[in-house]
């Protein structure tokens, strides 16, 4: 499988939408192009009570997925969004790096 530029657990910044400029981490991938980011794109959802499953009804806030093109990986050294490239390290493994300064993301 091809290596992805953004992975689960990466520190990202939101590029567009109502949460533009927020920094957070990727929680999970919903599909190939949709990502759930912690505390971003939160919406209120109405939940019906279900006593057999011990679910209390009411209004809850959940995180909805956003498109992967609306986020960018965050470079903490430069304190801004950055692009990701791929290269092979000395042992022959493929690793990600920041294109602006060449520092490795995967150590």
Swiss-Prot record:
Task: Tell me where on the tree of life, at the top rank, the source sits.
Answer: Bacteria
The UniProt subunit note reads as follows: Part of the 50S ribosomal subunit.
A Gene Ontology biological process in which this protein takes part is: translation
Q: Which family does it belong to?
A: Belongs to the universal ribosomal protein uL24 family.
**CDD domains recorded:** KOW_RPL26 (cd06089)
The UniProt GO MF terms for this protein read: rRNA binding; structural constituent of ribosome
Q: Name one Pfam family in it.
A: ribosomal_L24
User: Mind naming one GO cellular-component term on file for this protein?
Assistant: ribosome
Q: Which PANTHER family match?
A: MITOCHONDRIAL RIBOSOMAL PROTEIN L24
**Gene3D superfamilies assigned to the protein according to its UniProt record, in alphabetical order:** 2.30.30.30
- Biological classification of the source: Bacteria, Pseudomonadati, Pseudomonadota, Betaproteobacteria, Nitrosomonadales
Per the UniProt entry, the signal peptide is: none
UniProt keyword terms in alphabetical order: Ribonucleoprotein, Ribosomal protein, RNA-binding, rRNA-binding
* Protein name per Swiss-Prot or TrEMBL: Large ribosomal subunit protein uL24
Q: What does this protein do?
A: One of two assembly initiator proteins, it binds directly to the 5'-end of the 23S rRNA, where it nucleates assembly of the 50S subunit.
């Amino acid at each position: 499988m091809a290596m992805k530029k953004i992975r689960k657990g990466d520190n990202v910044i939101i590029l567009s939408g109502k949460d533009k400029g927020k920094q957070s981490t990727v929680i999970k991938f919903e599909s190939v192009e949709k990502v759930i980011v912690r505390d971003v794109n939160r919406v209120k959802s109405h939940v019906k009570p279900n006593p057999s499953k011990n679910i209390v009804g009411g209004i809850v806030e959940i995180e909805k997925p956003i498109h992967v093109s609306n986020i960018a990986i965050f470079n903490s050294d430069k304190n801004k969004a950055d692009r990701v490239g791929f290269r092979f390290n000395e042992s022959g493994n493929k690793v990600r790096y920041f294109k602006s300064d060449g520092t490795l993301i995967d150590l």
